[in-house]
Amino acid sequence: VPVNVLKRSVLRQLKNKRTEIANSAGLGADCAVFAPFSKGQMVTCVQEGVVELQCENDLAEAEREDLSVMPMRRIFQKCANNLAAAGAEPVAAELVIFLPETVEEPELKALMEEAEKAATDLNIQIIGGQTRVSSAVRQPIATATGYGILSEAAVTQASAGKKLAGQDIIITKWIGLEGTADLAARNREKLLERYPAYLVEEAAAFDRYYSILPEAATAVKSGGCTMHDIS
């Protein structure tokens, strides 16, 4: 994208800061710099998705069936969940967005505002990335690379943890939570023909339970030997 668009609609939307980051990438600076830390380890993960430019219930029929289409906030939540499942505290993310030629600047700005809100809610600093326009894509595609810090205690615990007979398998919240929320949000009108509105809206609102960060932190403190985010 042009430099003025990059400044106005991308970089200016990034406000959340963390002490673990010495410098973010930006104009003329292609690399972010992490502040030195003496204990623990760096953990990283990647989450991708086709990004919605409109609200979920306005999706085209084909998009309703494609679960790779998701709001920007979901990409960040999945990234944070994966880091937390590794026992790490999410601290930073890089965001790459490929845009179709039909996308206007206000839509890009809205995507970045949504990304920044999602990152801020998770206390993640967006430290860099790329924003490109390409005739090869039909819808915005986003990839977030997340970075987390695994504390020294968590490193020791993970290396000592063993899966043994007699251990408990603990599942938090509910199986099918994400799928239920997706189906309800993408098919509101169809579901309202058969079910009461309160039931459909409650199901669609299950997205408020997506975060596993509190449970993951508890598992680390409690000596869990392994974790996995099944979303």
Stretches found by the model and what they are:
Residues V1-S231:
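Helix-biased detector of long, well-ordered alpha-helical tracts
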